[in-house]
């Protein structure tokens, strides 16, 4: 695997991304009823806002787009499967740009990339299938909210920890990739907080970890999106479009804010946001 050039990885990414764009364009063109159903109403603006806030967080922190966006969508009332499908479809575009940028800047460790990507794809496919076909959305919603709540607490605790110097270690990277992708597909987020934070905590270079994990995330989100499209379609393309619009607007702002806020401060803000919103979602689900 180490003999495979990153240029080929970038080429595959561009091919897959182009195929998804082509499919979405074809779907919209051949479904005029869906196109006519688009209304720039309050709901649409709420989705734009969710995408906007999530992208600002991700741009400043380098993770937590999915978990932040999914938490807000669940809080708004979007069903778990639709929320996860929408977030992952939008993420194909954001992670694609991010991954290609890291390849150009050579922020990637190829050995770590191939240890993550294959098990990550398998975990993403299994998780997406379960939330699409097996698990009942109404029943599983409070459990997903509880998972996001724990993830928020995890992020908050991480923000107060000092990372000690350790020898670089990615021995359990394949298992970590599977677990991160599996819960990411089911919960709509968690790949970054689970995979990135654990690899950095084990002493790996933050620069290479973020670049490698973000690039692998493109393939995770692409294949989970494929499963979602196959089983539940793209009826939620209104949500997807709103998330993309919000993310595009927020992208330069998030990159700008990173100059003024430390990563630990952002992690604390993200943790509090996720804990608060998830708690509210659980409360609504039980009453």
Regions found by a protein language model. Name each.
Residues 1-53, 59, 72-76, 104-186, ...:
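Juxtamembrane transmembrane-helix boundary motif
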Residues 68, 91, 144, 194, ...:
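Conserved active-site and cofactor/substrate-binding residues in soluble primary-metabolism enzymes
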Residues 64-65, 96, 122, 126, ...:
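Residue positions within transmembrane alpha-helices of multi-pass solute transporters
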Residues 84-92, 210-218, 248, 274:
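Transmembrane helix-bundle signature of multi-pass membrane transporters/permeases
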């Amino acid at each position: 695997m180490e003999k495979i050039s990153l240029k080929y990885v970038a080429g595959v990414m561009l091919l897959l991304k182009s195929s998804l764009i082509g499919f979405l364009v074809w779907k919209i063109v051949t479904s005029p009823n869906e196109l006519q159903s688009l209304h720039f109403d309050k709901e649409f603006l709420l989705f734009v806002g969710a995408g906007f806030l999530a992208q600002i967080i991700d741009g400043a922190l380098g993770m937590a787009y999915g978990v932040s966006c999914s938490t807000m969508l669940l809080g708004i009332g979007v069903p778990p499967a639709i929320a996860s499908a929408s977030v992952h479809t939008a993420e194909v575009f954001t992670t694609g740009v991010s991954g290609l940028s890291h390849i150009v800047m050579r922020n990637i460790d190829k050995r770590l990339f191939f240890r993550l990507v294959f098990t990550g794809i398998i975990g993403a496919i299994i998780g997406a299938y379960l939330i699409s076909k097996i698990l009942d959305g109404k029943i599983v919603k409070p459990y997903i909210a509880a998972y996001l709540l724990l993830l928020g607490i995890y992020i908050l605790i991480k923000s107060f920890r000092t990372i000690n110097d350790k020898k670089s270690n990615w021995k359990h990277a394949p298992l970590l990739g599977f677990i991160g992708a599996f819960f990411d597909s089911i919960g709509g987020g968690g790949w970054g907080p689970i995979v990135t934070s654990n690899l950095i905590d084990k002493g790996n270079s933050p620069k290479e970890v973020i670049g490698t994990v973000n690039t692998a995330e493109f393939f995770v989100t692409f294949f989970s999106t494929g499963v979602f499209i196959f089983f539940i379609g793209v009826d939620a393309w209104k949500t997807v479009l709103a998330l993309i619009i919000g993310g595009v607007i927020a992208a330069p702002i998030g990159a700008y804010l990173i100059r003024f806020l430390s990563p630990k401060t952002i992690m604390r803000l993200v943790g509090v946001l996720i804990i608060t919103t998830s708690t509210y979602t659980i409360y609504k689900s039980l009453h």
